[in-house]
Amino acid sequence: MTRIRRGYIARRRRTKIRLFASSFRGAHSRLTRTITQQKIKALVSAHRDRDSKKRNFRRLWIIRINAIIRERVVEWALSYSYSRLIHDLYKRQLLLNRKILAQIAISNRNCLYMISNELYKYKEVEESSGII
């Protein structure tokens, strides 16, 4: 059986892989076998971390909203929290997601306070009229 020299095809494949791993350190950017292993590992990490990024940002938004809601204890609500705010939003059928609420909380706290006050006033009206 004759030997097949894999000239430019193999070289082209390796250079394509090396371009991907050019920013890696040490042997991870020089040796072909370790480059392929690190490429697989990098792509797996990227795929996994795209999902965890979504979870982390949702957690951050919830923490920000809760901190600002609890910061201002109003006379009508001795303990108003994130969970009560979200519950009241769902009852009123308001379409404000956590990302928008967190942006409002950071940029304009008074606006978030106004939203929570309106929700609570609506809640009082429902309870007094016996709609519940």
UniProtKB/Swiss-Prot annotation:
Query: By its UniProt entry, which Pfam families does this protein fall under?
Result: Ribosomal_L20
> Localized where?
Plastid, Chloroplast
GO BP terms in the entry: ribosomal large subunit assembly; translation
- Primary location recorded for the protein, binned into one broad class: plastid
Looking up PROSITE patterns in the UniProt record yields:
RIBOSOMAL_L20
Q: Which family does it belong to?
A: Belongs to the bacterial ribosomal protein bL20 family.
| Protein name from the UniProt record | Large ribosomal subunit protein bL20c
